[in-house]
Amino acid sequence: MASHDHHHHHHDHEHDHEKSDGGEGKASWVGKDGKVYHSHDGLAPHSHEPIYSPGYFSRRAPPLHDRNFSERAFTVGIGGPVGTGKTALMLALCRFLRDKYSLAAVTNDIFTKEDGEFLVKNGALPEERIRAVETGGCPHAAIREDISINLGPLEELSNLFKADLLLCESGGDNLAANFSRELADYIIYIIDVSAGDKIPRKGGPGITQADLLVINKTDLAAAVGADLSVMERDSLRMRDGGPFVFAQVKHGLGVEEIVNHVMHSWEHATGKKRQ
């Protein structure tokens, strides 16, 4: 499944550069494969894949079997809508793991380098281990259709620091965005309760197919009238029983459980043992 995505990635771009049907200079055009392509701010063109269902955890794309971790370390992708706590989770994971493992991080922002600067300012990792990428207007493309903007910095950091683990934070996007398996070996999708308890049942690839769903800011539940038991029920149903964690990342609650999920997968993928 994941390798299928990858072939499409190259296939799409063969057509993109031709900009068929007189599409030169247009913001969007129809490729020879019938898909509508568009590009933003000079980023490589990409299409928006149609989504016909909320997705299924059991049918999610499996991690790649032929991954060479000496080329790029085990990569954790952290996605989710704007303001849910992605950068706070990046910081928490760095603090939890940095003393035992060699880490590096790449952040994606649409037009700024704010998230990367936040990690530097808060001492998540030494500054040289953090890269901030500006994705332009379509942040989902940088984690799915046009991942080269992230692969480059990740591979460079991995080799430079002999990394054990890489963290990649997506730009804030909608519920339909999710990481390509070509980029992320383990996918965390983070939502929060401030939008109400209906979010898990809305579904979308992030909620249903991420390896781990994190429901953050549970301390706000009472204030916004969100029922955590409803969120738990809907998360179990939407994710076919796939794992999720209630958390207050800013206060450290749930972080160790998240780390345990990540490191279990890291052990399984790399054959190494936790320190």
Curated annotation (Swiss-Prot):
One of its GO terms (biological process) is protein maturation. GO terms for molecular function: GTP binding; GTPase activity; nickel cation binding. Residues 13-24 have a biased composition (Basic and acidic residues). Residues 1-12 have a biased composition (Basic residues). Pfam families: cobW. InterPro entries: CobW/HypB/UreG_nucleotide-bd (IPR003495), P-loop_NTPase (IPR027417), UreG (IPR004400). GO terms for cellular component: urease activator complex. GTP binds at G80, P81, V82, G83, T84, G85, K86, T87. Residues 1-31 are annotated as: Disordered. The keyword Lyase does not apply. Keywords: Chaperone, GTP-binding, Nickel insertion, Nucleotide-binding. Disruption phenotype: No visible phenotype under normal growth conditions, but mutant plants cannot grow on medium with urea as the sole source of nitrogen. The keyword GTP-binding applies. URED, UREF and UREG may form a complex that acts as a GTP-hydrolysis-dependent molecular chaperone, activating the urease apoprotein. Belongs to the SIMIBI class G3E GTPase family. UreG subfamily. Required for the maturation and activation of urease via the functional incorporation of the urease nickel metallocenter. This is Urease accessory protein G.
